[in-house]
Amino acid sequence: MMRCGEGYPGLILAKEDFIMKPVDMAAADINAEYLGVPRLSLMENAGRAVAEEIGNAVDSGRVAIFCGPGGNGGDGFVAARHLLNMGFEVEVHLLGHPERIGSEEALVNWGVLGAMQPHPGGFSVDFVRDSSEIKPTDADVVVDAILGTGVRGSIREPSRSAIEIINRSEAFRVSVDIPSGLNPETGAVEDIAVSADLTVTFHRMKDGLKLADPAVTGEIVVRDIGIPPAAEIFMGPGDLLRIPSRRPGSHKGENGRVLIIGGSRQYSGAPAIAAKAALRAGADIVMVAAPGSAARAIRSLSPDLIVRELEGGYIGMESLDEILELAEKADSVLMGCGAGRETSTARTFMRAIEDLHEMEKPIVLDADALRLMDYSDVSEYRELTVTPHMAEFSSFFKLKSMIFNDFRESVSAFQSISSRIRGTVLLKGRIDMIFQGDRLRLNKTGCPGMTVGGTGDALAGLTAGLRALGLSSFDSASLAAFINGMAGELAMERHGNGFTASDMVDMIPSVMDPGFYGF
């Protein structure tokens, strides 16, 4: 297999150049396991990297490692074992009862340390029940493997007392991945944080480390732990972490409102499928604006949709004010599904897009909308997502026939073409390609049964639904491709080749559940 990332223009793979947010790192970690790289291996590599950096800084002596109950603590357990192999004396202090260890990989490595006890000398392991049991240490090196990147806000005991003891120590202070207590996104210290002499972070530089006071981070070293580039290029279940959680106490409509403008005298199924997919994506309210007979058919298909009946058999200028009134209430707008290719519809869509752009409304264009206009009409709209298949892509970007020698060449060409617009392009195919400027994601989910009609409408609805939840145009399109393909695979598994787009839409909640993938 070719190395993912090679030859892709604008895709930055150098670790010192690309800065990750915590969610990017968490997603890459899960996606690596999805590709077949066990997280236990990643933890082993991380812990060994910490031990090696300590060995580079200090020749010998005693190392005290304070470990939390999560993955950061697991890295500390592994580091302890490697430091012992390097000739250091090591003491490990778990902050809490072993039953609180929440990471399966950390629990495995805690078990390894336990199996090494009692040790003939120079190695001890204990756990503290409360902060009163944490004592000052006179070790030569103190390691902070307490909190990692998942903690924000005030620091609770016994972590607080451990941080205070580390900061009072005259030892060489090392933080694992990020100093405990540092906000991993902003670099701010919101309560209390370890002041490290050295921070060993993994895979890539993190937002918070780049922004933080050097007095808190000390020297920062980025170490490779074996996450393949494919874990960041190919979509995977880790990317589901990008979907925002619903706020407790939120009210109807606060978790996304979608407007779908489509349908015509001939087509009512396309906007209905798109609308149901948007609901399944998690949007609270989905409104459909469709011409007469299509609107009545859609209303009869689902009581969960709000349907506005427009005049005539096709969308025309007489409905523009009504469409814009509905759009005012929407968080995203999808246009084109089943709309037909009437001249009046093209005029209405172009005028609506101009007004929606002024309103800064996220827009998704699919199907007939991509035949009624071309890229030059919308090239400056950053809040735009287009979801073409290859024929629609060629029409929208005014292309003639293209021949490529290999997959890499096709990706490079499609990315260059897609950069003609500021928005996001989701090019549907056997391998979906998602582009925005120099950004690229690929998606391999899906199955042959998805040639059935309506699967593209479901994808467009998913994209609009996720966009309404607050995801960026790039992330919503990328996630929609992954979810849509997985829903197709699950529908095929349950119904065989005869599954319909509606069967596929019903699978969406299942494949959006991280538990479906065992994570």
Swiss-Prot record:
The keyword Phosphoprotein is assigned to this record: no
Cofactor: how and how many bound: Binds 1 potassium ion per subunit.
Region described as ADP-dependent (S)-NAD(P)H-hydrate dehydratase: spans on this chain: 235-519
Entry binding sites for ADP: 428-432, 447-456
Chain intervals for the UniProt region annotation (NAD(P)H-hydrate epimerase): 1-233
The entry's keywords: ATP-binding, Isomerase, Lyase, Metal-binding, Multifunctional enzyme, NAD, NADP, Nucleotide-binding, Potassium
YjeF C-terminal domain boundaries: 235-515
Binding site for (6S)-NADPHX 2: 338, 457
Region (NADPHX 2): 389-395
Entry's family note: In the N-terminal section; belongs to the NnrE/AIBP family.
Cited function: Bifunctional enzyme that catalyzes the epimerization of the S- and R-forms of NAD(P)HX and the dehydration of the S-form of NAD(P)HX at the expense of ADP, which is converted to AMP. This allows the repair of both epimers of NAD(P)HX, a damaged form of NAD(P)H that is a result of enzymatic or heat-dependent hydration.
Annotated protein name in UniProt: Bifunctional NAD(P)H-hydrate repair enzyme Nnr
Organism of derivation: Methanothermobacter thermautotrophicus (strain ATCC 29096 / DSM 1053 / JCM 10044 / NBRC 100330 / Delta H) (Methanobacterium thermoautotrophicum)
